[in-house]
Amino acid sequence: MAAKIIKFDQEARNCILKGVNTLADAVKVTLGPKGRNVVIEKSYGAPLITKDGVTVAKEIELEDKFENMGAQLVKEVASKTSDVAGDGTTTATVLAQAIYRQGAKLVAAGHNPMEIKRGLDQAVEALVAELKNISKPIKDHKEIAQVGTISANNDKTIGDIIAEAMEKVGKEGVITVEEAKAMETTLETVEGMQFDRGYLSPYFVTDPERMEAAMDNVAILIHDKKIANMKDLLPVLEQTAKSGRPLLIIAEDIEGEALATLVVNKLRGVLNVCAVKAPGFGDRRKAMLEDIAILTGGKVISEEVGFKLENTTLDMLGQAKKITVDKDNTTIIDGYGAEADIQGRVKMIRAQIDETSSDYDREKLQERLAKLVGGVAVIKVGAATEIEMKEKKARVEDALHATRAAVDEGIVPGGGVAYLRALKVLEKLQLAPEQQFGVNVIKRALEEPIRQISQNAGVDGSIVVDKVKNGKDAFGYNAADDVYVDMIEAGIIDPTKVSRSALQNAASVAGLMMTTEAMIADKPKEEGAMPAMPGGMGGMGGMGGMM
């Protein structure tokens, strides 16, 4: 085991503070509407220019191991806030730095760090309750657009596109962000349930111009195995041909004789049919087939539950108003499933989302949920250059997260005003004298976001803090226009979830750093002297003959 270096007490806390300050000072220049950019060197390609706090934080790695520990702990604050709320990373970093800087001074002066932390925790609890109290629910298109605009660094176009996407696919809908081929940023929406499987043969196409199969009032056969043998499929084909309805077959695969027969019948006009592979793989495929069955009011024809393909009857088939299938995707619009069954399925998927610990599984479950209840919207981000596109795409993703957070928990006045308004709740706290120091730490720290926003805008932070403190309700400083306004009316708002998460995560990590008494790191390996070069380059004499 490698030898370790250990640092204690004040020396350890000073190292943490240096690391915290280095990282926070690089991140906090990006805060607010007049925040500056940070340029990050990349090992290949052009440097990355960003105004996103968490991107800056993730790039920082310090040479000194002990200082690096401090930096990494604050990085954790930014990452955690980004994971929970999708935004507020810079605010969280600024708060963590302010809390730790104040707390470290008190500990150095001989105060008990554990008591300070207790006071800190109680203050945060009271502040979170007060933020929820100040919070106002968000409903209309205009407010959603305002949240998106603020999070996208005052880009109104992005705010409007996000609000439109939310309106079209609903709160549970999936909104994805992709890079566009053109310069414009556009929105595409898909109604109903879409999955990424296209037709198995181009002969199923009904609209040659658009190369898609479109069918109305469709019966849907959902099967979880391969279909290769025609005699298994024949009974259900005869029944649907008699009913005169088009048929969509969704199965693990359709091949050989079965596929050939379907194509021949389609070309002869005997049967309007289309076949696609089932979406997903393994257990996820089974779950998605069940989703389709519930949405369309049909059953999954599976031998596991005692249904055989040859015994399938018309009442086991799903039904939908319209289906379109192109070479890559199948879209089912207006399935005939019972509303109660769909809601039951939605409830079950929501429970699974809450229980899962895997981010990948959660994302896939949310996609399934969206397909059942809302739809899917795709924001295609366009820009003149690749560097600008990457920066813009990151802003759109930030704004999207913030908007979802706002719809979840409501909004509070932005620009750091909500923190100043919540301060009044701390006057009511009755704590022991040592714990009161923890409350004082947080009181000063909550002024830091508005102070930093003002400084980035080239204004004296202390004057702004003083003026806003003396105001009421949503009165605050609009750094973009250098005026004092009603923040809610001016559309300068923050999602409550973002403000709350930033404060909780910052206080949690800063409290842990404050109560740190020892630090342990690996001892750097000493570089030995370089080995001597071997003597003489023997054996090279014979190279004269190469002329």
UniProtKB/Swiss-Prot annotation:
Keyword Isomerase: yes
GO biological process, one term: protein refolding
Domain of life: Bacteria
EC primary class: isomerase
Primary location recorded for the protein, binned into one broad class: cytoplasm
First and last residue of the signal peptide: none
Single GO MF annotation: ATP binding
CDD domains: GroEL (cd03344)
Gene Ontology terms: cellular component: cytoplasm
Subcellular location field: Cytoplasm
Catalytic activity entry: ATP + H2O + a folded polypeptide = ADP + phosphate + an unfolded polypeptide
Entry EC no(s): 5.6.1.7
PROSITE patterns assigned to the protein according to its UniProt record, in alphabetical order: CHAPERONINS_CPN60
Binding residues for ATP: 30-33, 51, 87-91, 415, 478-480, 494
Pfam families in the cross-refs: Cpn60_TCP1
Alphabetical UniProt keywords: ATP-binding, Chaperone, Cytoplasm, Isomerase, Nucleotide-binding
Family membership: Belongs to the chaperonin (HSP60) family.
Subunit composition and interactions: Forms a cylinder of 14 subunits composed of two heptameric rings stacked back-to-back. Interacts with the co-chaperonin GroES.
Function: Together with its co-chaperonin GroES, plays an essential role in assisting protein folding. The GroEL-GroES system forms a nano-cage that allows encapsulation of the non-native substrate proteins and provides a physical environment optimized to promote and accelerate protein folding.
Protein name: Chaperonin GroEL
Organism listed in the record: Citrifermentans bemidjiense (strain ATCC BAA-1014 / DSM 16622 / JCM 12645 / Bem)
